[in-house]
A protein has these predicted regions:
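Outer-membrane beta-barrel transmembrane strands
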Residues: 190-212, 216, 220, 294-309, ...
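Acidic/histidine-rich helix-loop elements
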Residues: 78-86
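Outer membrane beta-barrel
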Residues: 54-74, 86-215, 224-255, 336-338, ...
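Outer-membrane beta-barrel proteins
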Residues: 74-78, 120-122, 141, 161-166, ...
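Alpha-helix capping and helix-loop boundary segments enriched in small/acidic/polar residues
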Residues: 184, 221-222, 407-408
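Hydrophobic alpha-helical segments, especially transmembrane helices
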Residues: 3-4, 157, 356
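N-terminal periplasmic/intermembrane-space "pro-region" immediately following the signal or transit peptide
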Residues: 2-68, 114, 139-142
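Outer-membrane beta-barrel pore domains
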Residues: 27-38, 83-84, 129-132, 246-254, ...
Length: 424
């Protein structure tokens, strides 16, 4: 009886938090140019569209934000029986501050600050970038035909490798993730980068370069090589008819350095979305448990992403492989994921679905095979375009390849989460 009361109290608290915030986030939509709306309208938007959907009259600053609150009821265990006890309660709320500024016709600035995060309780700048869709600030009509299909992006921010990063939770911006956790191998990093995107008649092409560094520094030592990271994407995205949309992309990322290019699966400074899990009674806790980072140097990664939407049915998949060089051990990991959703209601404001995610491979050739599986089942309700509440059951298992004295040996965590979100 007490457990049921806890659940009811938690649900009431989360719902009350949402409805109190909904007054300030009623279907807000900006008229910024070439912009992905930070609302339900931004669902299933990947690269920013090449339709302006706004006119430039003067410099315009749009201040927005994200807020996410969780109730977590997860248990964990391992073969050593040396993990901390977990209860059912509210996690630390997370919040983002978003500043988007239209500087000129076709010239826009984005800046995001994590006001509160699992990994940083204090305010912490995630990154920012400038997006250029017109070059009229150089000269009216400059390269006009090219810029009708091209977007130039430069900054210190997340770069466009793969499609999964468009659907992930970015600290408190959880609106586009139908579940609570991100994928086990979470391909996301913020680095100094520049990229060019071409979109024409459904064709998508991206080519870009980063400096391969998450933490910037000009200090060098005997191991510094400062190798650049190169990445790209080719794909096709078409609304075939009113009911059917098809998208298929393939992306690659490559860095031959020893001191750079190691952050592709460890670049998120917000922290994972599951709290307290797999924390040993002795030893330091990690804010990133539940994820897996190969920590490869001289890596090459490839990610293939199918996306299909037919009426309310939606499928998104990941086929991904990352490997390092022969000198570094010739290791390799493969990630597979499939996410199936059914969106329903007059505006598809409700959804139900499931996700299966697995990572397997080895750190060095002929080494012990590691295998991790996760299942998510849940659903959500968009109370308005800017307000979402979601419920999930999840189960993650560390299946193979962990040493007898590792806390991951026989490891498992499973349970229920309620997550409430406001984004505007």
């Amino acid at each position: 009886m007490k457990k049921h009361l806890t659940w009811l109290s938690a649900g009431a608290f989360v719902l009350a938090s949402l409805t109190s915030g909904a007054v300030f986030a009623q279907d807000q939509e900006t008229d910024l140019q070439y912009f992905r709306q930070n609302s339900k309208e931004g669902l299933n938007v990947f690269e920013t569209p090449k339709e302006a959907k706004g006119t430039f009259e003067k410099v315009k600053v749009v201040v927005g934000g994200d807020f996410a609150l969780q109730f977590q009821s997860i248990n964990h265990s391992n073969a050593l029986n040396n993990l901390v006890d977990l209860g059912s309660n509210i996690n630390l709320p997370t919040a983002n501050l978003n500043i988007n500024t239209q500087l000129a016709d076709g010239l826009r600035l984005h800046l995001r600050t994590y006001l509160s995060a699992k990994h940083h309780n204090e305010a912490w700048v995630k990154g920012g970038h400038m997006q250029i869709d017109k070059l009229d600030f150089i000269k009216p009509g400059f390269l006009e035909e090219f810029m009708k299909v091209a977007t130039i992006t430069v900054g210190m921010d997340e770069f466009n490798y793969g499609d999964a990063h468009f659907r992930r939770s970015d600290n408190a911006r959880v609106l586009f993730n139908p579940f609570v956790g991100n994928y086990i191998m979470d391909s996301f990093s913020t680095e100094a980068f520049g990229e060019v995107t071409i979109q024409s008649n459904g064709f998508i092409g991206v080519v870009g370069v980063t400096n391969g560094k998450l933490n910037q520094s000009v200090v060098v030592n005997s191991t510094t090589d400062n190798k650049l990271s190169f990445y790209g994407k080719l794909g096709f995205d078409k609304q075939i008819n009113e009911d059917f949309r098809f998208r298929l992309t393939g992306s690659w990322y490559m860095n031959n350095g020893l001191s750079t290019g190691t952050y592709l699966y460890g670049g998120d400074r917000g922290g994972s979305r599951y709290y307290g899990i797999m924390q040993a009674l002795e030893g330091t806790a990690s804010d990133f448990e539940g994820r897996f980072n190969p920590r490869f140097k001289q890596m090459t990664a490839i990610q293939i992403n199918p996306f299909i939407k037919f009426k309310g049915l939606e499928f998104f998949g990941i086929i991904e492989n990352v490997g390092n060089s022969e000198d570094q051990g010739n290791g390799s990991f493969t990630q597979l994921a499939g996410e199936a959703l059914y969106r329903f209601g007059t505006t598809e404001q409700f959804y139900l679905g499931g996700r299966y995610n697995t990572v397997s491979g080895n750190s060095v050739e002929n080494g012990d095979d590691i295998k991790i599986n996760r299942v998510n089942i849940g659903g959500g309700w968009f109370m308005t375009n800017n307000v979402l509440i979601k419920l999930e059951y999840m189960n993650q298992q560390y299946k193979e390849g962990f040493a007898a004295d590792s806390k991951y040996n026989g490891g498992e965590f499973k349970g229920v989460n309620i997550e409430a979100a406001i984004s505007f």
